[in-house]
Curated annotation (Swiss-Prot):
GO molecular function: zinc ion binding
Main location: membrane
Family according to the record: Belongs to the inorganic carbon transporter (TC 9.A.2) DabA family.
Name of the gene encoding the protein in the UniProt record: dabA
The keyword Transferase belongs to this UniProt entry's keyword annotation: no
Natural source organism: Bacillus subtilis (strain 168)
Domain of life: Bacteria
Record's protein name: Probable inorganic carbon transporter subunit DabA
Tagged with keyword Zinc: yes
Membrane topology annotation: Peripheral membrane protein
Keywords: Cell membrane, Membrane, Metal-binding, Transport, Zinc
Function: Part of an energy-coupled inorganic carbon pump.
Positions contributing to Zn(2+) binding: C396, D398, H577, C592
Length: 871
């Protein structure tokens, strides 16, 4: 046996073996511990998740220190990222200096200011200390003569298995992880495996308990250790904690350590527990399985020495830092008094790598903020320049909409609007012939209504038969592939067709993809459909359709959010957005985050149809919102991969609306060409001068070997809430979420509050997902797409036994193996409104205030006089 950490009495209170852990109610401990992970939903509906959503009650830098101490995870940008940003001119070093001076002013050290500044300036270059200095005998001698720091770091309680190695030198926690991954995959499988886990209906813990006695990966003695274990998960967890002698005061921290060992699988268990009352205790069951397995594995090594050391600070790097960065000689150091040495050591310890990276990150963020403010303020439009729009097009706030909107406005008398892509209709959508519905709204909300597609009975019956034929063929193929006997015959039966498909997909992907898609559409011949907008009295968990009051409420709310309560154009187009890619497990990550990881076209159709209802218009007119008689609402979907606008719902148009429609159609090829060229030029190794942008965009969408069909929301950095005139003349480089807002129409502040709670939260989650996947890809990302394995129908792993990877793949944030494309900046929220509006928002929304104060988002405002203020 090997102990990988020295255990001392000083770190942990003496274990009181009289504590009867079995009598403790673990619910509070588990609920509190679960804050260190975030729910993880299936990849088929991939929506952004903030990995630190449960930790926002703590400052960002404290969480950074905690993660570094507990998991050795650094959530600040690496030195190489910072150098690259500096070399590209993305960081103004004046802001680094300002941050340094503020830090020096706020700390009191008995060190000359010029000496401290010289040390800090050299250390901020982020160069590593020379290895020959660290290993020198002279330094070793100085260390032996030094009394050291009067400071000891805390060590957080880790799983006991992390301290033990087996005879082969492998840590037992790694073996434990392997077992837990295996059982988690079996239980959570979503119809991918041919055989389901026996006794699954009894719950995770009970199913595991039935099968563990037959696990060949465990020895007979290990299986016997849990043979008589309690049949209830919470009792088993209590039993395991008691057997491991975990002190009551350390239980929560101990559970946190186990949850953080496999945050992906634990996050999926947490999400499942929140979705179903049947699985409400699933996280408890997960911990019961994991810690019971730990007990079975480490029993022969117990009891461990009742000592776990505090992590004492190594002073060698601190002395070396003063010699290398501070310019001190070995002789000068040896001549210092003990108190002087302690003062210098304390200073070097405080100005550690984390603080240095923090100063660089804040300077990076301030540089972006400063340049954005200059760009916006310098290009403010003069009053009265606005012309009446022939058409108004409402797009999702998604950063990919910004270049498309900018180019569209250049080509004609069009006004574009930004709004969350579910358009304020909290619905579950059910497509024609489907038995399943999708919650097409932000993950943080629950659907209030279900809207179904339907068609005439005779037409639908024939369509459904054609659809079932395709489904049956696909199901038969999958069944044969998973069956032990029929899988031997499958290559002979399917080989010719699959060979032809593989060759076509590989050598002519664009033509092959178009041919297969056209063939499928020609066979299905999906009929024209209608939507179940009207309330169905049939009782259901979620009501089908809307009541008359709901129709008016949702239409009114959306129009106010878009600022369309007056001066409404003849044609208003509600534009959802989606993406197009082939052989891409992360396709949902490229769709609309505000629609729960699906395309937003369905929601666009619903809102457009509501706004065309005569009874809705009459009710709105009574409230002072007049929609002109010749105004028509239509719906379209913006394909962000090929930058194409696809019409979904175009009712009978008035003469003025028809003119607007034709003009949009006329300019769309030019818009698409320019946006494709702008977007594709940012992809690595793309030669824009040598290739047709439209053809190349289509190839990216159809090529099944393409690991980066588009950049998605990479480089997102700002969320701007204000009138379109604020940013209309600005090239925001596809980095800003844009939400329309007119403070003059929001006296109560309710609209602003709703934007922050809904779209603002979604944007922040997206931002932090990209941030985390960039700065800590090994822990919060999902690795290389080319080596990923889709598992259990839920997510991806690297290989066949890793954590369930929760973040974005390498190709979504990295330009190359050594160069990041995404700039890891925390989201800047800019509000165009008087100062008192922002003050009221912060006073009423304590959760948002907490995010701002703790550094999870940055906040700025622009008042009517054009004064920019950072909060």
């Amino acid at each position: 046996m090997g102990i990988t950490s020295v255990l001392t009495k000083d770190n942990v209170k003496k274990i009181d073996t009289d504590i009867d852990v079995q009598e403790r109610d673990l619910n509070v401990f588990i609920t509190s511990a679960s804050r260190v992970i975030a729910p993880l939903w299936p990849i088929s509906t991939f929506a952004a998740r903030n990995p630190w959503m449960g930790l926002e009650n703590q400052p960002f830098d404290q969480v950074a220190s905690w993660l570094k101490n507990t998991r050795d995870v650094d959530i600040y940008p690496s030195a190489s990222m910072i150098r690259s940003a500096k070399n590209k001119g993305e960081i103004d070093e004046d802001f680094v200096e300002m941050g340094l001076q503020r830090w020096l002013d706020s700390h009191s050290y008995h060190i000359p200011r010029d000496v401290a500044e010289r040390f800090c300036h050299a250390a901020l270059k982020l160069d590593p200390l020379p290895s020959d200095l660290l290993s020198s005998h002279e330094l070793e001698k100085l260390v032996s003569e030094c009394s050291g720091l009067d400071h000891i770091e805390n060590v957080f309680m880790q799983p006991l298995s992390s301290y033990i190695e087996n005879q082969d030198g492998e840590r037992l926690v790694n073996i434990l992880d392997h077992h837990v991954i295996k059982w988690s995959k079996l239980y959570l499988d979503d119809s991918q495996a041919g055989w389901t886990m026996p006794n699954r209906e009894e719950g995770f813990y009970r199913a595991w308990q039935h099968l563990i006695q037959y696990d060949p990966a465990l020895s007979k003695k290990q299986r016997e250790r849990v043979k008589g274990w309690p049949k209830e998960a919470h009792l088993a967890l209590q039993e395991a904690l008691f057997a491991l002698e975990i002190p009551e005061s350390e239980i929560q921290t101990y559970l946190e350590g186990h949850l953080l060992s496999l945050p992906g699988w634990a996050g999926m268990m947490l999400w499942r527990s929140q979705q179903s009352s049947h699985e409400h205790a699933l996280l408890t069951e997960y911990l019961a399985v994991r810690i019971s397995m730990e007990w079975a594995l480490i029993k022969p090594y117990l009891p461990l020495t009742n000592e776990r050391s505090k992590k004492t600070i190594s002073i060698a790097p601190l002395i070396a830092a003063w010699i290398h960065w501070g310019g001190l000689t070995l002789e000068e150091w040896s001549q210092m008094t003990a108190s002087e040495q302690n003062e210098y050591l304390s200073f070097a310890y405080s100005f550690d790598e984390k603080l240095r990276k923090k100063l660089w990150l804040e300077a990076w963020e301030q540089t972006y903020t400063d340049r954005l403010s200059q760009k916006i303020i310098s290009k403010q439009r003069e009053t009265g320049r606005e012309k009446s729009a022939l058409a108004q097009l409402a797009f999702c706030i998604d950063v990919r909409s910004e270049p498309f909107r900018r180019q569209l406005e250049k080509e004609g008398p069009f006004e574009t609007i930004g709004i969350a892509g579910f358009f304020g209709v909290p619905i579950a959508t059910c497509e024609l012939g489907s038995k399943h519905s999708h919650a097409s709204l932000p993950i943080i909300q629950k659907p209030q209504n279900k809207i179904k597609e339907f068609a005439d009975e005779d037409v639908f019956k024939k369509y459904n038969q054609r659809k079932q034929a395709i489904h049956s063929l696909s199901h038969t193929f999958k069944t044969m592939k998973q069956n032990a006997l029929s899988s031997l015959l499958l290559p002979e039966l399917s080989g010719p067709w699959l060979t032809l498909q593989m060759a076509a997909r590989s050598f002519v992907p664009r033509k092959a993809g178009r041919f297969i898609r056209n063939l499928r559409e020609a066979w299905l011949r999906k009929p024209d459909t209608k939507l179940s907008l009207h309330h169905d009295a049939t009782e259901a968990e979620i009501p089908v359709g809307f009541t008359d009051e709901e129709k008016v409420n949702y239409a009114r709310q959306a129009l106010k959010m878009m600022g369309l309560t007056e001066n409404i154009a003849p044609l208003v187009v509600i534009c959802g957005h989606g993406s197009q890619s082939t052989n891409n497990p992360y396709s949902a990550a490229l769709d609309c985050g505000a629609c729960g990881g699906a395309a937003g076209g369905f929601n666009a159709r619903v809102l457009a149809a509501l706004c065309n209802l005569s009874e809705v218009r009459e009710a709105l007119l009574a409230e002072g919102i007049k929609i002109p008689e010749d105004t028509v609402f239509a719906a379209a979907e913006h394909n962000t991969t090929v930058d194409e606008l696809h019409w979904l719902y175009v009712p009978e148009l008035s003469e003025a609306a028809q003119e607007a429609f034709e003009q949009i159609e006329a300019v769309m090829p030019k818009v698409r060409h320019h946006v494709n060229a702008e977007r594709l030029a940012q992809l690595p190794n793309f030669q824009s001068k040598l290739k047709n942008p439209k053809a190349e965009a289509n190839r990216f969408a159809e090529d099944w070997s393409e690991i980066r069909p588009e950049w998605g929301l990479a480089r997102n950095a700002a969320f701007i809430i204000g009138k379109r005139e604020l940013t209309q003349d600005c090239d925001l480089e596809g980095r800003a979420f844009l939400h329309n807002y007119d403070w003059k129409q929001d006296e109560s502040g309710e609209l602003l509050a709703n934007i922050i709670v809904g779209p603002g939260t979604v944007a922040q989650w997206i931002n932090l997902q990209y941030y985390a996947s960039t700065v800590a890809p090994h822990y919060y990302g999902s690795g290389n797409k080319a080596t990923q394995t889709v598992t259990a129908g839920l997510g991806v792993m690297q290989g066949n036994a890793s954590d369930l990877l929760a973040g974005l793949p390498w190709q979504s944030v990295m330009e190359s193996d050594h160069e990041a494309y995404h700039s890891p900046l925390r989201l800047l929220i800019l509000i165009q409104a008087p100062r008192e509006y922002v003050e009221r928002l912060l006073n009423h929304d304590s959760a948002f205030l907490q995010k701002v104060q703790n550094g999870w988002v940055r906040l700025a405002s622009l008042d009517p006089e054009g004064c920019w203020e950072s909060w």
